[in-house]
Amino acid sequence: MINYNNIVFDLGNVLVHLDMEGYLNALAGLGLTEYLDAKLHPESRQLMHKLGLGLISTSEFCNEVRSMSGLNITNKQIVDATNKMLGEIPDVKKEALLKLKAQGKRLFLLSNTIDMHWDYCVKELFPYKGYQVDDFFENIFLSQRMYLDKPHPMIFQEVVRQTGIAANDTLFIDDLEANCQAAHQSVGWHVYQNKHFDDWLQLLV
């Protein structure tokens, strides 16, 4: 049972299953592993960070990838490969969101994401029994639209500024400890670190 009236959800590894193996296989298929695997190529991490902060567009990202790799590949190929990171949002989680809303909970989404991932989620992953993404959440906060990302304190402060949610009545669910700590320290939210993909569902029991 969740006793908080405001619940702020992360996206990846909380609602959306992340398929890193599928992503790396897609990169390998295009010959991009050494360029877009952040573990192998530090520039890739910087490029994705700029994309996640809204500092470059998807087209600019694709141009950078072609420049780095020297490969003759299309924007669509790059976008499709990047979106292979996204698995599914299980129906049980969509049902859980709808149940929480029906109980009068105020639901919010706060995600470090990128436009191509978000577009895919909106079109392919969130639709359910006639519901669209805006039916699940009162407000949606995305790093690339806010020009801020977690765990920077200002992103949490901006959510509070826009929503007016009270710290003592707010639960933040995120898979990363650093984000949970920052949310608690900067705005006083109660936090739950979702260490395994389905863990937060036990809060509903």
Predicted regions and their residues:
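Asp-based, Mg2+/Mn2+-dependent phosphohydrolase catalytic module
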Residues: 1-4, 9, 114-115, 122-205
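A generic structural motif
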Residues: 104-106, 189
